[in-house]
């Protein structure tokens, strides 16, 4: 089967947009998604520090268009994206929690709830009580989650995924790979991702 990896951090609005569509893309193409939670701040610190300067001093014209573009995409994807009072949010704990959800088989539901809590309901998803509420909403045991996110294994998995993305040439979230080498960045590349997945699947069928 064609390999399809989705590297993501729930603190990114553009990742929320991609996330809202990517499962349908995978179904249409007949592939499974390999979910790769990362800490996008770690990626920025390593290879894309200009993000911080752009946030602190946005170009006025480009900044106005950014707001419109995000609003247009949110409407197109039928998701609610507001202005969280805490932005950027400290996402390390919620991204560790994604691994617990992944192991429990409910990562898509957990990530969806996290995106909705932060971008739709404007909750501070760095807070333990908000993470617990998200976990409960998808049936995760809160006590197990609290212990697991402090484990060396989960911490290492988040660090490893983040370092893997950097090593493979990634610089932000969402980043997608098809068959290891073919990289795509950003929500607006999903149309290209779908075309490439279809082509890869057709090639396998004909082989």
Question: Where are the regions a protein language model picked out?
Answer:
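Structural alpha/beta surface segment adjacent to cysteine/selenocysteine redox centers
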Residues: 16-118
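C-terminal cap of thioredoxin/glutaredoxin-like
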Residues: 2-5, 9-32, 36, 106, ...
């Amino acid at each position: 089967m064609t390999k399809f990896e989705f590297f993501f951090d729930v603190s990114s609005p553009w990742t929320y947009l991609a996330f809202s569509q990517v499962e349908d893309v995978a179904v249409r193409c007949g592939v499974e998604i390999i979910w790769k939670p990362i800490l996008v701040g770690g990626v920025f610190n390593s290879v894309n520090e200009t993000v911080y300067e752009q946030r602190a001093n946005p170009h006025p014209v480009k900044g106005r268009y950014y707001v419109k573009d995000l609003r247009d995409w949110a409407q197109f994807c039928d998701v609610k994206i507001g202005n969280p009072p805490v932005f950027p949010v400290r996402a390390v704990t919620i991204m560790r929690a994604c691994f617990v959800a992944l192991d429990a088989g409910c990562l898509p539901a957990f990530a969806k709830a996290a995106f909705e809590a932060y971008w739709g309901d404007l909750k501070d998803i760095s807070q333990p009580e908000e993470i617990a509420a998200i976990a409960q909403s998808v049936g995760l045991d809160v006590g197990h989650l609290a212990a697991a996110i402090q484990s060396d294994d989960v911490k290492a998995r988040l660090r490893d995924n983040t370092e893997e993305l950097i090593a493979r040439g990634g610089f932000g979230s969402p980043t997608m790979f098809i068959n290891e080498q073919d990289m795509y960045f950003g929500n607006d590349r999903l149309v290209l991702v779908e075309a490439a997945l279809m082509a890869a699947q057709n090639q396998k069928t004909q082989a």
